[in-house]
A protein has these predicted regions:
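Flanking helices and flexible, charged tails adjoining ferredoxin-like Fe-S electron-transfer domains
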Residues: 1-2, 45-115
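Iron-sulfur cluster-binding cysteine motifs and their immediate structural context
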Residues: 5, 14-38, 45-63
Length: 115
């Protein structure tokens, strides 16, 4: 069992979830975060920290959102681990994607933090 970052995180990346994770299971992409399901201990501490409700238990995933679980697993193997809170992405206040739009916008390229 694990928690999953879904579409609501795309182009937001608040990172408040990162500071409370006891096992450092968050990984950072260019425009979203993911959780490594092999590291997540299902503690649920991160879920209420997300101001856009992008984090959910895999047990509560809707059928149409199950691809996010696979995405989290895949990208957590190639993106860098994030342990420090950062500012949200510029313009996050205006992000209002449908789940399909978010899926199209999510970057799958390896992320290089230049800050």
């Amino acid at each position: 069992l694990t928690y999953v970052v879904k579409s609501e995180c795309v182009d937001c990346k608040h990172t408040t979830c990162v500071k409370v994770c006891p096992v450092d299971c968050f990984y950072e992409g260019e425009n979203t975060l993911v959780i490594d399901p092999d590291v997540c201990i299902d503690c649920a501490i991160c879920e209420p920290e997300c101001p856009v409700n992008a984090i959910v238990s895999d047990r509560k995933l809707k059928p149409e959102d199950h691809h996010w679980l696979d995405f989290n697993k895949e990208m957590s193997k190639v993106w860098p681990n994030i342990r420090k809170v950062k500012d949200p992405m510029p313009g996050y206040e205006d992000v209002n994607y449908t789940p399909d739009e978010a899926w199209e916008k999510v970057s799958r390229i390896p992320f290089k933090d230049i800050t």
